[in-house]
């Protein structure tokens, strides 16, 4: 079966790379914020291949903004989902890369993905990162809004994926 989930992309590939907020237990210790080097490498590889890329670092843009979870057990550090949507509204894009670095972040990342896909149903949604690499089948079943998972180092795979989309070839 051929997969043409990218059929809505007709005017060139325009990509946003999103680093989501970080979630930690409310009463736990927080490690220092680490820069998203993997996303920086992916963005650089795509830019060098002449793809249009914009980045949103939801943690880096608001590292001290705390949002307490409804059950009062967790703290999200970074932009809220509403703020992420506001950032996206100022960008023209048809492909969204989302990084899931840590399994503890999956619940908030899944919620953000579902919210974004509801607001932008025609985007092509790509996920990568350590959590995705560790359990891609689970992630795609748990969040069917994901179109493709990139496993392991993402630089070459991301470039190959966008070339495939740009050339309107099958993903299979």
PLM features per residue range, with description:
Residues 31-35, 102-105:
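Aromatic-acidic/polar surface patches that form glycan- and anion
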Residues 10, 32-34, 115, 166-167:
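Short, solvent-exposed amphipathic alpha-helical segments in soluble enzyme
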Residues 1-9, 87-88:
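Short boundary motifs at domain starts and secondary-structure transition points
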Residues 24, 35, 151-154:
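Active-site-proximal structural scaffolding
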Residues 45-49, 54-172:
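Glycine-rich beta-alpha loop elements in corrinoid/cobalamin-binding modules
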Residues 6-8, 12-33, 124:
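Short glycine-rich His-centered loop
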Residues 32-47:
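Short catalytic helix/loop segments, enriched in acidic residues and glycine
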């Amino acid at each position: 079966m051929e997969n043409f989930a990218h059929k809505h992309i007709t005017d060139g590939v325009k990509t946003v790379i999103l680093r989501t907020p970080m979630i930690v237990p409310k009463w736990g210790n927080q490690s220092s914020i680490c820069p998203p080097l993997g996303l920086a490498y992916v963005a650089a590889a795509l830019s060098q291949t002449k793809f249009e890329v914009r980045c949103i670092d939801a943690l880096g843009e608001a590292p001290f903004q705390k949002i307490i979870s409804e059950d009062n057990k967790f703290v999200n550090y970074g932009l809220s989902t509403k703020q992420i949507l506001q950032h996206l509204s100022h960008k023209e894009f048809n492909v969204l890369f989302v990084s899931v670095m840590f399994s503890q972040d999956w619940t908030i990342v899944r919620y953000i993905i579902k919210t974004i896909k509801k607001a932008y149903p025609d985007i092509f949604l790509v996920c990568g990162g350590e959590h995705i690499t560790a359990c891609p089948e689970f992630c795609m079943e748990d969040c069917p809004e994901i179109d493709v998972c990139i496993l392991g180092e993402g630089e070459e795979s991301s470039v190959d994926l966008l070339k495939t989309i740009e050339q309107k070839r099958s993903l299979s």
